[in-house]
UniProtKB/Swiss-Prot annotation:
Gene coding for it: CAP1
Alphabetized Gene3D superfamilies for the sequence: 2.160.20.70, Adenylate cyclase-associated CAP, N-terminal domain (1.25.40.330)
Domain of life: Eukaryota
Native source organism of the sequence: Homo sapiens (Human)
Protein name: Adenylyl cyclase-associated protein 1
Main location: membrane
Modified residues (Phosphotyrosine): Y31
Keyword annotations of the record: Acetylation, Actin-binding, Cell membrane, Isopeptide bond, Membrane, Methylation, Phosphoprotein, Ubl conjugation
Amino acid sequence: MADMQNLVERLERAVGRLEAVSHTSDMHRGYADSPSKAGAAPYVQAFDSLLAGPVAEYLKISKEIGGDVQKHAEMVHTGLKLERALLVTASQCQQPAENKLSDLLAPISEQIKEVITFREKNRGSKLFNHLSAVSESIQALGWVAMAPKPGPYVKEMNDAAMFYTNRVLKEYKDVDKKHVDWVKAYLSIWTELQAYIKEFHTTGLAWSKTGPVAKELSGLPSGPSAGSCPPPPPPCPPPPPVSTISCSYESASRSSLFAQINQGESITHALKHVSDDMKTHKNPALKAQSGPVRSGPKPFSAPKPQTSPSPKRATKKEPAVLELEGKKWRVENQENVSNLVIEDTELKQVAYIYKCVNTTLQIKGKINSITVDNCKKLGLVFDDVVGIVEIINSKDVKVQVMGKVPTISINKTDGCHAYLSKNSLDCEIVSAKSSEMNVLIPTEGGDFNEFPVPEQFKTLWNGQKLVTTVTEIAG
């Protein structure tokens, strides 16, 4: 009896230690108030590991950096928690219809918009590249609606982030290692998510085959509905009983019909002979008495929904900006201006040109770098740039260097003419996802010769590696 008592006490102590460890783990993950994980689906537990690993590291470093990066990280964290709630729902409930599914995804979609809007509202931020990296890739949270290839979709978003994280690395690699660690932590979220999707949701979000149809998100850290699916809707009322009289009538009519059919040719004996004076095409007088001929019923067409025309929302015009903010020249929202000039520049200053339309800008002196973003029909003339000139998300841009520039980068741009000076003939032209690019080389007579930048390539496997060459289209 004493041995049994000792065994019970040892078991109780062991259980107590396990509960303490479990509680500490939950507190560490920040989900102590979330539903119990004892019965959580394996892919929910795996997602929790992702939250406790790279996500927690990203949040920690973002908090150390502070400012806009920390605020942005908190928004990302909210989006990930909403995604976890959807995973809990999917693990317990069946997939709803398409229109209901969009309602379930709405909170995640709204959070994605909030993250993107934060970047747009803080274009003057000193940490704008950090915000852009997050904003360009946060749509990866939408993988839950992507089928049958959610994994490649996340990779595409991750690649979009790297365009800006490379800038962060270039700016901080010799200045502050904390920002380098931030880049590694943030990108690891999406690489880990790709591995997670490959293991649990290869062709799309895996829904439960049993349980009620999902109606709302469950598994949120707080809220009365956390951890359980909504109760199933009540069954539809039974159809009204069919009248026995109508049943007997239909049965009798059907029997009569088959009886007449079974008569064979003898059924024609009951038909009356129609003489010529009874035929309308033989007797015009009878045709005149018969009145207008009725047309048959029109084929069914679904009624068009009557929608009241919604008034067009007046787009708010942003104020034009031309100012020096710290070490950044901001040129924004300029339209139909042909004489903009920036003078008194310094080597450490940069220029950011955003949303300018049909505008010409001249930058005098030597400057660190120039970025042209989301501009149309922009003419840019500058003297010297020691770093890089970047053209992003723009259309019909003309750039002329009077002095020297080492690199011109063209990304997601349709129509770009780069006029080089004699001192810039060794300039590197780097392009991606762009079209109608031309480089103009000066001649001895003062004119320019135009050379198109290749847009079409051919790639072959030579047995050891891929070899890519330019493909020329024969005209």
